[in-house]
Amino acid sequence: MGRSMFRLLFRKMRHHLPQLTGMGLLVMVGTAFFVTLYTIYLSYDDHANRLFRNQHYADVTFYGSFDDNDVAAVTAHENIRLARGRFVRDFREGDVTLRAISLTDGVNTLYLYEGMIPAASDECAVISRHAQARGIELGDTILVDGRELRVTAIIASPEYVYLSQNERALMAEPDRFGVVYVAEGFFKSAYTEIVALGDISKEAADEIGEVIGAARTVVQDNQLNKVLFTSDLKQIRTCAYIFPLIFVLLIIMIVYVMTKRTITLERRQIGVCKAIGVAGGSLLFLYMAQTSFIAFLGAILGCVAAALLCDTIIGLFSTMFEVPGLAYVFYPALCGCVILAFMALGALSVLVSVRSMLK
């Protein structure tokens, strides 16, 4: 009986091949959409947070005019592990605005793509996106405030995952705006920022800011860079769910209509099968198995397509943000859950459409 049921199953699949093929393509596209976007979501979240962690992204930044005593006052707070003063200033060279930032040991450390961290006052490290846009390479010289600086490193920074100049220029053109990191000896004025690491609340940070006379105090979660990261992460996750839902609805509709029509046309065959002792459950399995099998094949192909497309999509996203090492990562649990979900969807769609007819 089992062998004959399987022969009947594949005979019915051949008979409904066009409809099943259409359903399989929808499953494949829906799976590819979801797995691609959700993989990017998981990979982006993982790599970006690793960058923030490993490069010691500042938990709080104080803006104003400070000296070493102010840095010491911040360091003395019980919830602050480390604090560093630094200089930040924008310089305009022709059509290009360069933001020069002094290096801070242990806070907002640089991720090196190539080269060495600047040590002398006539050296600098250039953020990668700006270097690529202007064709800057190691050993080149660039003008900052009329001074020639030799490029010793191409870098990424945890505070510039997004190349944002300010709140009015969230996505600055990389050939018009760049960030360079310089040795502290480049500047001769008071610190303009204090960056600190620590498990500190916004209220406690604001209190410290008042003590040192900061013009503005911003915790990490409110930094423009982190706000953009969090917002994009949520949007990618939302899109990962919204687009596949369209295909899910189409799949349900196709399976429902196809199965209803098939049951109507095969009512006599169903009656004969029941007359010779075939249980209604076995007949139900027959219709559920063909859609689940096609859903399984479509989901497998969708996962393969996602693996092929993911790096290309990440490359497109990389025009908006820069996270070192961001690439396709295979998540077995994700693919497994998607495959099972589409198989269950196919089976349930059949169950809803035929349960009353096979009683």
Regions found by a protein language model. Give the residues of each.
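Membrane-interface segments at the starts/ends of alpha-helical transmembrane spans
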Residues: 233, 237, 324-333
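Residue-level signature of the cytosolic catalytic core of signaling kinases
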Residues: 1-2, 328
